[in-house]
Regions:
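Acidic, glycine-rich active-site loops and adjacent beta-strand->loop/helix elements
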Residues: 196-200
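Intrinsically disordered, low-complexity activation-like regions
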Residues: 1-184, 202-482
Length: 482
């Protein structure tokens, strides 16, 4: 009988097996390519790919030193109090928890691509690398990843405890960081609060997202005050954080009664910073940063109209002319919005993405431009839904939405425009097209998309004559169309 000799087995004609591979490759006794967070062999079953033992071994080996005879090994009381604290703050220890490797892999490959589908690669890479050195940020990312995964598989209750565990750890770590003056002025601290805020928005936690957003405002203000005394411009990662905050704050201010944390929409001169792609469509926001102060002003004027006309109690289409001041403001806003309509993605954006995706980014920008005009006409000038200027903006929004592929990543950027168009149309074909596109967007696993679609259907079914923002305010429903 011709049996196989171990010496002739090709599987044995290889270098000795490394001991720093993932747990699954070591168990199967196969070579691991050491890719993080999931190696190539485990890509189909990422939950089984763990590097926890290698983390411990490497750290233990690095810290090990030769004992010196005659000298005590016990540290002083002061040192003893530090050692367990440092060990507990090791972020890599988080990845030894069940499912943490899978959740980190899911965040890198899925969650961040849904939140910021066109962001420059350096943003995601830096975010994850920073989290590996910052426990509270890592916990926040794991909580966001778990929330997103739970919505994708439509089993939120099954993962609720895991989300809560990582959220509580992130909040505890954030509080500890805020108590330390040296930690408060680190971008990582503001980033943790921003991740928690965004996850609250996606989960519909109306009370806590405002608390976190207000905290981010204070942290960023302090950080930028320090930057003014330092040489050079903010790094790209920090600018992405600024734009992330600005995009959420702007849309929160336009979605309901939230006044915005930065009322004038200037966002620390983001719109005049050459490093923010001034004159181009921004990859984080999906529109030009020059539109930010104009959107903020529209939100201000809209809220002032609601207050002055007391339309929370009774609302009818306006029969009196606008004040001279408001008319002038509206005309100025219209001119300034139209002046930036033709902005296109930057050369850097074109280098990172294919031509189709870059073209869709221009469509997202135009969708925001026409949505801004729609809100200006309806909520500031108080034009009726049937007015030609209003109808023209609804048509233009839907034209640019249709120019974006149904399942393109760019759909993640257009929740506010498509919701705005849906609230201002009575045309059945337009409503059907909007519902179909929003159903596609809902499959991305962001909870605010689901709530927006449900709210729009509720508004349509009500047949209410009042404007959408008035209707939702009276109903006690608050949305953040981010």
């Amino acid at each position: 009988m011709a049996g196989r000799s171990p010496d002739n087995d090709p599987q044995n004609l290889r270098a000795p097996r490394r001991r720093d591979g993932c747990s699954e490759c070591r168990r199967k006794k196969v070579k691991c390519d050491l890719r993080r967070p999931v190696c190539s062999r485990c890509i189909r079953f990422p939950k089984e790919c763990r590097y926890d033992s290698s983390f411990v071994a490497v750290r233990s080996h690095c810290r090990k030193s030769s004992p010196v005879r005659g000298k005590p090994r016990n540290p002083s009381p002061a040192k003893r109090s530090v050692i367990p604290l440092r060990a507990s703050l090791n972020p890599l220890a988080c990845l030894t928890c069940p499912d943490s490797h899978f959740l980190m892999h899911h965040f890198v490959t899925q969650t961040i691509r849904v939140l910021f589908p066109l962001a420059p690669p350096v943003f995601g890479q830096t975010l994850v690398a920073t989290a590996m050195e910052t426990p509270h940020l890592l916990h926040a990312l794991l909580a966001a990843s778990c929330s997103h995964y739970a919505r994708l598989v439509q089993k939120p209750s099954a993962h609720q405890l895991t989300v809560l565990k990582f959220t509580n750890l992130a909040v505890a770590g954030l509080r500890a960081a805020l108590a330390d003056p040296t930690e408060t002025l680190r971008p990582e601290t503001a980033m943790t609060a921003m991740v928690l805020c965004t996850n609250d928005v996606c989960n519909g936690n109306a009370r806590t997202w405002k608390v976190h957003l207000s905290g981010v405002t204070q942290l960023l203000t302090a950080l930028l005050a320090r930057h003014k005394t330092a040489d050079g411009d903010p790094d790209p990662f920090f600018l992405c954080l600024l734009k992330w905050f600005a995009a959420l704050d702007i849309l929160a201010g336009l979605s309901g009664t939230h006044e915005g944390c930065v009322n004038d929409g200037q966002y620390w001169n983001l719109t005049r910073n050459p490093n923010c792609g001034n004159g181009h469509v921004d990859e984080i926001c999906g529109y030009s940063t020059q539109l930010m102060p104009l959107l903020a002003r529209i939100g201000q004027l809209a809220r002032r109209n609601v207050h002055e006309q007391s339309i929370f109690e009774t609302y009818t289409e306006p029969s009196s002319a606008l004040s001279e001041e408001l008319t002038h403001d509206a005309q100025d806003l219209e001119t300034r919005i139209l002046s930036i309509a033709n902005q296109v993605p930057s050369a850097a954006t074109l280098a990172f993405h294919d031509q189709v995706l870059a073209s869709e980014l221009h469509n997202t920008h135009l969708a925001f431009i026409h949505s801004a005009l729609l809100h200006l006409y309806r909520r500031v000038e108080l034009l009726p839904k049937s007015h030609p200027k209003v109808r023209a903006q609804v048509t233009a929004i839907l034209y640019n939405v249709q120019a974006i592929k149904p399942f393109s990543p760019a759909n993640a950027l257009i929740l506010w425009p498509i919701f705005s168009a849906g609230c201002e149309t009575d045309d059945l074909q337009e409503r059907q097209a909007i519902q179909t596109r929003m159903a596609n967007m809902q499959t991305m696993g962001l909870g605010n998309f689901t709530r927006a679609r449900d709210a729009l259907a509720r508004y349509w079914e009500s047949g209410a004559s009042s404007r959408w923002d008035v209707y939702f305010a009276q109903s006690g429903l608050e949305l953040v169309l981010f």
